[in-house]
Amino acid sequence: MSGKKRTASSSRWMQEHFDDHYVKLAQKRGFRSRAAFKIEEIQEKDKLIRPGMTVVDLGAAPGGWSQVAVKLAGDNGKVIACDILPMDPIVGVDFLQGDFREEKVLDALLTRVGDAKVDVVLSDMAPNMSGTGGVDQPRAMYLVELALDMCHQVLAPNGCFAVKVFQGEGFEEYMKSVREAFKTVKTRKPDSSRARSREVYLVATGYKL
C-alpha cells in the first residue's frame, strides 16, 4: 500500500509542478492563460496564421489564444473572438460575449465577419465538465461540430482550422468529417497539454469548398 501511496503522491507532485511551470511562464510572458502555449506550439509547427489574415477564435476567454493570434495577424489582420464568458479587452480583437450554441449569437458573429472570408478558425471550446463521460463527451462533440459548421460558413478556400477535441465516442466520425473538408489533417498534442487529458488538437489545412 505504501508504494501505491508514494506513486499517487509523486504523480500529483509532478502534475502540480508541470502546471505551476506553465502558469508561471504565462505570467512572465504576459499571457492570460497557459493555453497560449498550445496555440504557439501549433503555430510553430503548422504556420497557420500570417500577417494580414482574418482569424475567428471560438471559446476565447480569458484570451490566451487571441493574444497570440492578434500578434501574428498584425496591424493589417483581424481577430474576431467569441465566448460565453466575459473577456477583458485586447487591442485589435473584436470580442463578442454569448453562447455560440445560440442562433442569435452565431448570427451576431457572422455579422461581425461580414462578407469577407476568414483565413483561420480556431476553437478551444469545451463544455463545463460534470465528470460523467456519457454526458461530457456528447457535449464536447456538439461544440466541435458547431465549430466545423462555422468553417463551412466563413472559411476561405485553402483556409485553416485548429480545434480542441476530446478523444472518445464520436471522435473517429468527427475526424472523418474534417478530413472530407480539408486537404490535410494532423493530430497535435502540445507539450503544454496535460498528459492525462484526453484532449488533442486537430490541425486542418487546405479547406475544400
From Swiss-Prot:
EC number: 2.1.1.166
Main location group: cytoplasm
Chain positions recorded as S-adenosyl-L-methionine binding sites: 63, 65, 83, 99, 124
An annotated GO cellular component: cytoplasm
SUPFAM superfamilies associated with the record: S-adenosyl-L-methionine-dependent methyltransferases
Record's catalysed reaction(s): uridine(2552) in 23S rRNA + S-adenosyl-L-methionine = 2'-O-methyluridine(2552) in 23S rRNA + S-adenosyl-L-homocysteine + H(+)
Family annotation (Pfam families): FtsJ
Coiled coil: none
GO molecular function, one term: rRNA (uridine-2'-O-)-methyltransferase activity
Localisation per UniProt entry: Cytoplasm
Active site location: 164
Record keywords: Cytoplasm, Methyltransferase, rRNA processing, S-adenosyl-L-methionine, Transferase
Gene3D superfamilies: Vaccinia Virus protein VP39 (3.40.50.150)
HAMAP family reported in the protein's UniProt record: RNA_methyltr_E
Function: Specifically methylates the uridine in position 2552 of 23S rRNA at the 2'-O position of the ribose in the fully assembled 50S ribosomal subunit.
Protein family: Belongs to the class I-like SAM-binding methyltransferase superfamily. RNA methyltransferase RlmE family.
Protein name (database record): Ribosomal RNA large subunit methyltransferase E
Record organism: Shewanella sediminis (strain HAW-EB3)
